[in-house]
């Protein structure tokens, strides 16, 4: 199956999403349930457009050493610095083709077979997190991502993830902006540095804070002892009028990049975008909506096709900019138009 075939198939299988040739957030702008953004629906398109305003510096006066796109992270080696982003409640947002267990297992196993890995989701229904942990166990590796619930529930979910073999865990702290979290008793949502530190210490495995958009926030995550951060605005789904992740990444990387792992998401769609993210200071990227489309359009074959496309594009970028390894990619490789 090719990427184009999976995309075409998804158009008859997926709800609330048009499986567009270019996943730029415009056609689905305010579609929630579905892949849309909050409020005016401008943040997801802004994420995408910000990457398009960064260009690559052609330079082939370099040793012809071949290209290595692999990365070592989470104590594992992966073929690409790319991971599928955590998405839960897929039946609600994307239609009934799969239940949560089926979708998450396909995603986790498909990503591992393709040489990468998935972050898995969470939600009000306990099934969402449990499905991710079950899929992680079957796939051999995934990163469970817990919502910023009240302390006792976070501890319970950390225990559950570790019992199923988690080697790292994340918290999408920006989910504080989701209505169901705001309404919970006891209170859930934003966390202090001290509360985050409790989670980090309790986990005892690398803990990643997802939803950091400022240098100030990155420094707080560092102070809490997080192993890494994910620069993310939740795909535009939690706060309208946010800047694009590409616009804030460099400053954050300058502040904490030598002290913790940095992953970024938001509008990354091609291997060229992956290259740009690494040049700005990220160690790896998360990609969300396109991987959902691939599951609905082609299951594990769709995941393999899209991942192969990303690898071919990233390889080409590296060859044509004189970068033999990911470590060679830096800001001298990009141009801001």
Set out the residue ranges of the language-model regions.
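Alpha/beta enzyme core
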Residues: 109, 137-138, 149-264, 271-294, ...
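Flexible, glycine/proline-enriched loop segments at strand-loop-helix junctions
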Residues: 94, 119-121, 142-149, 181-187
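Conserved active-site-proximal phosphate/metal-binding subdomains
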Residues: 1-29, 217, 236-261, 268-337
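Generic structural signal for well-ordered, non-membrane alpha-helical segments
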Residues: 37-40, 44, 100, 104, ...
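An N-cap/entry alpha-helix motif that binds or orients negatively charged groups
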Residues: 2-78
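Long, hydrophobic, well-ordered secondary-structure blocks that form the structural core
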Residues: 117, 128-152
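Structural signal for hydrophobic packing residues in well-ordered secondary-structure cores
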Residues: 51-58, 111, 115, 162-165, ...
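N-terminal functional module of multi-domain proteins
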Residues: 43-129
């Amino acid at each position: 199956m090719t990427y184009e075939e999976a995309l075409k198939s998804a158009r008859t299988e997926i709800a609330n999403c048009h499986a567009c040739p270019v996943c730029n957030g415009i056609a689905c702008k305010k579609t929630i349930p579905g892949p849309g953004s909050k409020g005016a629906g401008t943040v997801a398109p802004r994420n995408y457009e910000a990457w398009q305003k960064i260009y690559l510096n052609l330079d082939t006066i370099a040793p012809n050493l071949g290209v290595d796109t692999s990365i070592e992270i989470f104590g594992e080696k992966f073929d690409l610095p790319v991971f599928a982003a955590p998405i839960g409640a897929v039946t609600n947002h994307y239609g009934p083709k799969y239940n949560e267990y089926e979708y998450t297992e396909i995603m986790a196993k498909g990503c591992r077979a393709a040489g990468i890995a998935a972050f898995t989701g969470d939600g009000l229904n306990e099934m969402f997190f449990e499905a991710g942990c079950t899929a992680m166990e079957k796939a051999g590796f995934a990163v469970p991502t817990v919502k910023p619930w009240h302390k006792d529930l976070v501890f319970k979910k950390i225990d559950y993830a570790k019992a199923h073999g988690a080697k790292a865990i994340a918290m999408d702290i920006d989910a504080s902006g989701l209505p169901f979290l705001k309404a919970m008793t006891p209170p859930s949502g934003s966390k202090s540095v001290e509360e985050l530190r409790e989670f980090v210490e309790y986990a005892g495995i690398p803990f990643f804070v997802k939803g950091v958009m400022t240098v100030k926030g990155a420094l707080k995550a560092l102070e809490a002892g997080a192993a890494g951060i994910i620069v993310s605005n939740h795909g535009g789904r939690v706060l309208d009028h946010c800047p694009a992740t590409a616009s804030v990444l460099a400053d954050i990387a300058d502040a904490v990049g030598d002290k913790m792992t940095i992953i970024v998401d938001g509008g990354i769609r091609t291997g060229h975008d992956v290259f740009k993210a690494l040049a700005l200071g990220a160690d790896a990227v998360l990609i969300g909506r396109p991987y959902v489309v691939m599951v609905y359009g082609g299951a594990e074959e769709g995941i393999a096709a899209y991942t192969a496309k990303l690898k071919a594009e990233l390889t080409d970028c590296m060859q044509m900019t004189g970068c033999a390894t990911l470590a060679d990619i830096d800001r001298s490789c990009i141009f801001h138009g």
